[in-house]
Amino acid sequence: MADRLVRAMAAGGGIRLVAVTTTETTRMARERHQLSFLASALLGRAMTAGLLLASSMKVAHGRVTLRTQSDGLLKGLSVDAGRDGRVRGYVGNPSLELDLVGDPASFDFKQALGTGYLNVMRDEGQGPPYSSTVELVSGCIGEDVASYLLHSEQTPSAVFVGEHIDSSGIRCSGGVLVQVLPKAAREPALVALLEDRCREITGFSQRLEACQGDLHSLLRDVFPDLDPEVLADEQAEQPVEFFCPCTRERSRGALALLGAEELADMIEKDNGAELTCHFCGEVYRFSGEDLAALIEALPRSA
């Protein structure tokens, strides 16, 4: 089943909810980067969180970037997610495995990420991007992103991300975002109800798997008291996918920036060049002849 994102409201428009499945997206990332199960789980959670954050952007081409800077064995991760539902990402140590595959609930995310910071950058496509950094709270991604929303955007939020991974692979991956909008934040009873409900939620990954991709059902299961209603407009649902815009032509342009002298050195030493996209793992190879042609195409100095 293709991954999807659903937007909903509750409490007369005072509470915003977003749910997303990233099962195929995480599988693609694992295949592209040859990820261990632990690395797959963490990158899947980060891509899920990125899509949830990007879902509220005002412009279709808006993007959110998540990066961790920490001392953990994963050596950091980076995710680029768009309002258009396209997401990509990578981790520093793709082969990291700390726990038995047979017990995915015991994945030690805290040890994998370690202590450090989460940086979130929002780019609306006009003006300078907005960037904010918060300390990692748990390393489980959901609580870390919720901390960012509270401290950097002053929006009380809960972020639930999860997955089910066993020896056969990635069974499911996804998440839910719930936010109290400004007008509802002035209603203490509603805020208290939501806080109590969020504290009571357990076994999110099991709920995610049980819904079998039905995000409407997932929202009703997680927040039955809120009676969430999926938005009626055309933006209520959208597809989600792992996608990277890198191309051979862009790689050629990156090589051209090195200049004729550096390119000539590559021809002499390696008779070519190889560029690998960090975000998707795609490899672009250029022969010595390709580099020579690139040198010829460079503008001559006056």
Curated annotation (Swiss-Prot):
Superkingdom of origin: Bacteria
Gene Ontology, cellular component aspect: cytoplasm
Disulfide bonds: C244-C246, C277-C280
Gene Ontology molecular function terms on file: protein folding chaperone; unfolded protein binding
Keywords (A to Z) from UniProt: Chaperone, Cytoplasm, Disulfide bond, Redox-active center, Zinc
Compartments in which it is found: Cytoplasm
Protein's GO biological process: protein refolding
Transmembrane stretches, start-end: none
Claim: Cytoplasm is one of the keywords in the record: yes
Matches recorded under SUPFAM superfamilies: Hsp33 domain, HSP33 redox switch-like
Function: Redox regulated molecular chaperone. Protects both thermally unfolding and oxidatively damaged proteins from irreversible aggregation. Plays an important role in the bacterial defense system toward oxidative stress.
UniProt similarity note: Belongs to the HSP33 family.
Name of protein: 33 kDa chaperonin
